[in-house]
Design a protein with these regions (language model features):
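Structural transition elements
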Residues: 295, 327-361
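Gly/Pro-rich hinge or "lid" segments in bacterial periplasmic/extracellular proteins
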Residues: 177-228, 234
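Detector for C-terminal structural segments
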Residues: 24, 312-339, 377-385, 407-520
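Aromatic- and charge-enriched surface segment that lines or borders ligand/interaction sites
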Residues: 97-140, 156, 162, 298-299
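Ligand-site clamp/hinge motif
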Residues: 223-268, 395-397
Length: 520
């Protein structure tokens, strides 16, 4: 393992700290970044331009097919969401100016703003919201599972939306602040054009200058109810799959905000970029999806999953591949959240010998083989993952997957395990994304009666302190049963050119709201 990590140091220029946008600074000298300008001077704050890069184009802009992550920069600009998550990570009003739950937590009522309009000028009504949610609920896609407990969505009047639940869903307001909560125009949702040019009520519209798959140009709607909260008149989102090419774009001024790696920090600061460090923005996790053993029977055995957890030298991964911008962990939950339990750290120390013994006890003395998707997430980590698992007897074959199909590689059920970056959302949201039968990261729909009861207890608990204790029990179960193999939390370093500021202090959904302007 250590020898592979030593060799892997040569790969660090290609390592991305998160699943989000990655922009590297080269080791050659770079010129000072240019401020946003027009005709040779800094533009007024309201006329500034934001230019960022993403590694993959959106697979679709259909509300029922939206993916979170880098694609959010685009769709969250086109669509309003019912609620929003601020730069401190808290759920706040947005298109819905208020919301309330019934006493039994099975009815959520939202009140819409009165000044919502689609980009074409038509008013947004509760009927539009209900229609969008009902379509998402009935359409296969990443968002469908998040509405699994919804039994109906109604609009008793133009400004009221009522969501009925079969049982409490502690993450529902969080979902409605992200892709699940977008508002589409039901009259156009079924149109083929929605995949590329959807009708939304968000603060931006896609300009005719957009070249699908290459660059998405967003122009601010000054008639939007919240236009003043978006300081950039124009936002350009370039698709640049190669991380070194992203650096070149940053250096050349083609983009004016991007991620940098720790070794380039001083160089970036010397070149005039402002650096913002955000701690624990994601968790690098080997998702052991096939816990039912449908593709790889060995993964159904807890001893095998525990052995996999012992295969990784987490300290060395952080040191060599994350260049110290991270910390080892065996948990998938946010270290600043309710579910995190520091006492669980150290459950799986690096111990290949013990891992091999566990495999033998499980009936696999000679190990086994499995195929995993090679994605924009896994690329730089593949040599380490391959060698670590080979050292305990597990042979991994990597199958290339196009960047735009990264999410589909999880839901396809073709792969027993997937290397993934978990976004460190609220505990309930992480459970909904990873562990419920409908969860995106649980494609084989694994269940366990003991775990199901624990999740139900969490959902039914209204007291926040008591619920936090239950969340910790959830984390303990996931660690002891080795449902996945978390490796490390990773942070990010944002580099912004003069005139642009990165705002969040914690991990939040990547949207245009995370950027502000500086200077007069």
């Amino acid at each position: 393992m250590v020898s592979v990590l030593s060799r892997a140091r040569s790969l660090t220029r290609a390592v991305s700290a998160t699943v989000a946008v990655a922009a590297l600074l080269a080791t050659t000298a770079c010129s000072s970044p240019s401020p946003d300008s027009s005709a040779g001077g800094e533009a007024p704050p309201r006329d500034r331009e934001l230019r960022i890069a993403v590694q993959a184009q959106p697979a679709s802009l259909d509300p029922a097919q939206l993916a979170e992550g880098q694609q959010s920069y685009i769709w969250a600009s086109i669509f309003d969401t019912l609620l929003t998550i601020d730069n401190e990570g808290k759920v706040q009003p947005n298109a819905a100016e208020s919301w309330s739950y019934s006493e039994d937590l099975r009815t959520l009522t939202l009140k819409l703003r009165s000044d919502l309009k689609f980009s074409g000028g038509d008013p947004v009504t509760a009927k539009d919201v209900a229609g969008t949610l009902e379509r998402t609920r009935s359409t296969p896609g990443q968002q469908q599972s998040k509405l699994a407990r919804v039994t109906s969505v109604s609009a008793p009047d133009d400004s009221t939306v009522v969501i009925q639940l079969s049982e409490p869903e502690p993450s529902l307001t969080n979902y409605l602040a992200q892709a699940t909560g977008v508002i589409g125009d039901p009259d156009t949702l079924a149109a083929e054009t929605t995949k590329l040019r959807p009708a939304g009520s968000g603060p931006y519209i896609l300009s005719d200058a957009t070249v699908d798959g290459t660059e998405y140009v967003l122009e601010r709607r000054d008639d939007h109810w919240n236009s003043k909260a978006f300081p950039f008149k124009t936002v350009k989102v370039r698709v640049i799959a190669d991380r070194t090419a992203q650096f070149n774009a940053l250096q050349a001024g083609e983009i004016n905000a991007g991620l940098v790696q720790p070794p380039q920090r001083k160089q970036a600061e010397a070149a005039g970029f402002t650096i913002k460090e955000v701690d624990a923005t994601a968790a690098l996790v080997l998702i052991l999806a096939d816990r039912k053993g449908e593709l790889v029977p060995a993964l159904a055995d807890v001893k095998v999953r525990q052995a996999i957890n012992m295969a990784f030298d987490r300290e060395q991964v952080v040191k060599a591949l994350m260049q110290g911008l991270g910390r080892p962990t065996v948990q998938v939950f946010n270290p600043n959240g309710d579910a995190y339990n520091s006492e669980l750290e150290g459950t799986y120390d690096f111990d290949p010998e013990k891992a091999r013994k566990l495999l033998a006890e499980a009936g696999y003395p000679d190990g086994f083989s499995m195929t995993m998707p090679s994605t924009v997430i896994s690329g730089s980590y593949e040599p380490v993952i391959t060698q670590a698992l080979a050292d305990i007897g597990i042979k991994v074959t990597w199958e290339p997957v196009p960047p735009q199909n990264t999410a589909a590689s999880v839901s396809s059920r073709k792969y027993p395990a997937v290397l993934w970056f978990s976004g460190l959302n609220a505990a309930g949201r992480e459970i909904g994304d990873m562990y419920t039968p409908q969860a995106f990261l649980n494609p084989f729909k694994w269940q366990d009666p003991e775990f199901d009861k624990l999740l139900q207890d969490v959902a039914n608990e209204a007291d926040e302190e008591a619920q936090a204790d239950l969340y910790k029990k959830v984390s303990e179960y996931t660690v002891k049963q080795a449902l996945n193999a978390p490796i490390a939390y990773t942070g990010t370093l944002w580099a912004t050119a003069p005139g642009v500021e990165y705002l969040p202090k914690v991990n939040v959904l990547p949207t245009i709201r995370t950027f502000g302007v500086t200077g007069g």
